[in-house]
Amino acid sequence: VTVDCSGYPKPACTAEYFPLCGSDNQTYSNKCAFCNAAVEKNVTLGHFGEC
């Protein structure tokens, strides 16, 4: 499972809650928050939902 993070990082993310669990075992609140981290820290998607 992958998430398309082209166009990231973004300076601001919305507050919508659609959790994704990163390979760093951290829960990200939505795709924007996840993709910002993915671009900066080379995190990949563990699974959809909370860790």
Curated annotation (Swiss-Prot):
The keyword GTP-binding does not apply. It is found in: Secreted. Residues 3-51 form the Kazal-like domain. Keywords: Disulfide bond, Glycoprotein, Protease inhibitor, Repeat, Secreted, Serine protease inhibitor. InterPro entries: Bifunctional_prot_inhibitor (IPR051597), Kazal_dom (IPR002350), Kazal_dom_sf (IPR036058), Prot_inh_Kazal-m (IPR001239). The record marks A15, E16 as: Reactive bond 3. The keyword Repeat applies. SMART domains: KAZAL. Pfam families: Kazal_1. GO terms for molecular function: serine-type endopeptidase inhibitor activity. Avian ovomucoid consists of three homologous, tandem Kazal family inhibitory domains. This is Ovomucoid. It comes from Tinamus major (Great tinamou). The lineage of its organism: Eukaryota, Metazoa, Chordata, Craniata, Vertebrata.
